[in-house]
Amino acid sequence: MKVLVVDDDYAVLDAMKDILEDEGYEVSVAANGLEAFKELAQGPPPCVILLDLMMPVMNGWEFREKQLEDEGLAAIPTIIVTAHNKPEVNAAELKAATSIRKPIAPALLLETVGRYCV
């Protein structure tokens, strides 16, 4: 199953990619929302999108707004991944499936992704 990870912090991006690939997921990565849309246009949709909010070029809020405008993309569960104090508030505001707070615990990442990639 394919997962799209969108984060401009390459250490976080690489860590999530390694954790997910070790569990057998196929992982695509993007450093901002614009790159994420390019990834989404290239192949079958991922079972879930892990989305950071604070990024250059196109941030997570902008990405999510445009994602929700497209019926097909809006159907992909999106998990907000953020260092903000109340990530659940961001998830609700953005109509996301749920949220994970940074720093990311590997077990929580796998459990959360596993809920949407069955």
Residue ranges and their predicted role:
Residues D52:
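Active-site residues of response regulator receiver
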Residues V29-V48:
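Acidic, metal-coordinating helix/loop segments flanking the phosphotransfer/catalytic sites
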Residues I104-C117:
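C-terminal output helix
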Residues V3, D9-L13, P106:
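Short acidic/polar segment at the start of the alpha1 helix of CheY-like receiver
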Residues M55:
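Receiver (REC) domain active-site loop signature in two-component systems and cognate sites
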Residues I79-V81:
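Hydrophobic/aromatic residues positioned on beta-strands within the core alpha/beta folds
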Residues D14-D22:
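Charged docking surfaces used in two-component/phosphorelay signaling
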